[in-house]
Amino acid sequence: MAVTITVAAFIVLAVLGAGAAMTTVGDWYHSLRKPSWNPPDWVFGPAWTVILGLAGAAGVLAWMAAGDGNTRVRIAILFAINIVLHLLWSPLFFNLKRPDWALIEVPFLWLSVVALIVGLAPLSAPAAWLLAPYLLWVAFAAYLNLTIVRMNAPFG
């Protein structure tokens, strides 16, 4: 169990580190018009840290509940797809300065969280519930993304 927790912690930290390294929030972002309900910049780091920590815990619970290697492979594939989609959004929005492209990508990220919940629920109901904040935050971020696109389009 200690190895599983260590691996999950490493993956969460790697995702956080990669996301931070690939995100450059600069003058361009600060110049965008944003809705009055846009959270302050400092909220996003702690929010994602908690959400990805919960996702890591969900992965550990599901991994421990998995009865065989095939189930663990399925868990790993679901998380791998989610990680790729999670890491894709920030460069689209911030580095390429294309919130419109990020808006096209975000439904796939949201669906990958749904797939995680559906895939983990039969193994561990608590694991599935630990992913609920992730799903809600991505839905909120998608609506914020949509609003920013509407307030600032066109891009590119």
Task: Spell out what each predicted region is.
Residues 39-54, 98-109:
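Membrane-interface loop-to-helix entry segments
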Residues 17-24, 49, 61:
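Transmembrane alpha-helix/helix-exit interface in multi-pass inner-membrane proteins
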Residues 76-89, 103-116, 131-138:
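Hydrophobic alpha-helical segments of small multi-pass membrane proteins
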Residues 121-156:
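Terminal transmembrane helical module of multi-pass membrane proteins
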Residues 23-40, 149, 155:
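Cytosolic, membrane-interface loops and tails of multi-pass inner-membrane proteins
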Residues 1-21:
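N-terminal signal-anchor transmembrane alpha helix
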Residues 53-90:
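Helix-adjacent hinge/juxtasegments
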Residues 68-69, 91-100, 121-125:
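Membrane-interface helix caps and helix-loop-helix hairpins in membrane proteins
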